[in-house]
Amino acid sequence: MPHNSYPLLHTINDPADLRLVPRAQLGALADELRAYLLHSVAKTGGHLSSNLGTVELTVALHYVFNTPHDRVVWDVGHQTYPHKILTGRRERMATLRQLGGLSGFPQRGESEYDDFGTAHSSTSISAALGMALAAKIRGEERYAIAVIGDGALTAGMAFEALNNAGVADCNLLVILNDNDMSISPPVGALNRHLAKLMSGQFYAAAKNVGKTVLKGAPPLFELAKRLEESAKGMVVPATLFEKFGFNYIGPIDGHDLDALIPTLENIKHLKGPQFLHVVTKKGQGYKLAEADPVAYHGPGKFDPAVGLQAPATSPKQTFTQVFGQWLCDMAAVDPRLVGITPAMREGSGMVEFEQRFPQRFFDVGIAEQHAVTFAAGLACEGLKPVVAIYSTFLQRGYDQLIHDVAIQNLPVVFALDRAGLVGADGATHAGAYDIPFLRCIPNVSVACPADENECRQLLSTAFAQNHPVAVRYPRGAGAGTVVQAGLEALPFGQGEIRRAGSSVAILAFGTLLHPALQVAEKLNVTVVNMRWVKPLDVALLLQVAADHDALVTVEEGAIMGGAGSAVLEALQAAGVLKPVLQLGLRDEFIEHGDPAKLLALQGLDAAGIQASITKRFAALLVPGRLALKAVA
């Protein structure tokens, strides 16, 4: 982008440069930053609405605080593009979320200004508290700041941290970025004046001295306390956060630098835990995003002058769409079905379900632990809960999955979206670990559909069971298999031989069946669609093992403890010795990039699978040699 389009912004290579900008020019700088951000994301795709809403707050934080000496932890982290632009990564924004490029989230290894890696929500206060107390222990004068959205504040972990932080006696600032106006709007000039007053040292000192004096006269102290709360209640929310031990300031307009900067400058000189409530608007400064922040939450490439266009109709359904349609169809015939999502209504494909069955739809917010136990309670009373959740987010409810669902053997269906590689969101969102962490839990079954139609059928199979079942499926579309309209279920715990071939057999778990079939055409090997990791189809496995000289397992999940490990365990238990090649996601965190490229780098595309089999079992791949029993 030409420098003359952003004359101020192009002088900023780090926050030290930002602090040299006259305050009167910061508004113009924020305008340039917002325009640069909009046009940059329009070329790469990425999170937009949330970033447009944090421009002024980001400018103010880096202007007032001495970053990176002072620490800033951004909750969730998808709102950090302005932060990246101001901290030396402006020219790399063209590589955003691409293989080898900038992450869409903060990463400690990417910049010294990324103090803590985030992507899952509600972790910022805990991390910032740790940093603040570390500074206190080491005798270092610095502030630790957590920036958290009102949505992330619905998670229990955030309140656990607030409860701990309020009595920690350290320099911690929690900034509530209220971008849904779900708590309270700002109330004009009076509120701005009050925020400045409440963040001042005189107010803080007077309040503390007054409380100390009045504690000698309890009735007077309680009266003064109630009067203070009542006075604040006229212009600010109830003093919930002061109950945690914080000095509450706000709410103030998060797009008003003349309010933000003086307030932050006052806070910088205060001791102890501070809580600043700022109100921002998602999509701020771009009318189309302001009007529809959900649509512009994470758009692909688009023309800012035109806006998002209606996507071309794809001949392929996504797995998410298949799930959403199945959910509605099953709910129409079974009144026991209830749907639960932890703040992922759109992403999990539940919009139509909410519209058609509003009394049976529950969005519990960013509260995965609660979602799982809530489902358990519903199941106890004879309902059939379906929890639609991304694979990576089920990790956050693992204890509840074991303690509240599995031990009681309750019939909860977990529809695990985004299983396997997720592409641009990177390691934090990869659904790599669900097979290992689910298959080790007694009573829990795990299904891996190979295509869209099988996904629908296995969801029906899962729903028919009287115990917990997880059905894992990837992001995006599959092979383009036509999805049947019925609700027929596949046999529980049974796989199938899809192709008979030579003395090597590929055992495919999930959508990697399709590259396995491509390999089979070239190497003339057998391909088995296993469908279930647990219960494993041991009878089929032992039959295939008896008919072949070697086995290959393929899965889009962590290889350690995964489906391949289940095969090895079953063979060992049966006393069968057979060479087994395990192919899956390696023991490493896989960063962001194009999913197809990432799969190839893991050796899990057709070419990679073929190369691995050829290298390991070349002597067995004799043309024309057949496993006769498999053919029969």
UniProtKB/Swiss-Prot annotation:
GO cellular component terms, A-Z: cytosol
Residues given in the record as Mg(2+) binding sites: 150, 179
Names of required cofactors: Mg(2+); thiamine diphosphate
GO molecular function: 1-deoxy-D-xylulose-5-phosphate synthase activity; magnesium ion binding; thiamine pyrophosphate binding
Keywords noted in UniProt: Isoprene biosynthesis, Magnesium, Metal-binding, Thiamine biosynthesis, Thiamine pyrophosphate, Transferase
Residues that, per the record, bind thiamine diphosphate: 78, 119-121, 151-152, 179, 286, 368
Domain of life: Bacteria
Species whose genome carries this gene: Albidiferax ferrireducens (strain ATCC BAA-621 / DSM 15236 / T118) (Rhodoferax ferrireducens)
Protein name: 1-deoxy-D-xylulose-5-phosphate synthase
GO biological process: 1-deoxy-D-xylulose 5-phosphate biosynthetic process; isopentenyl diphosphate biosynthetic process, methylerythritol 4-phosphate pathway; terpenoid biosynthetic process; thiamine biosynthetic process
Assembly and interaction partners: Homodimer.
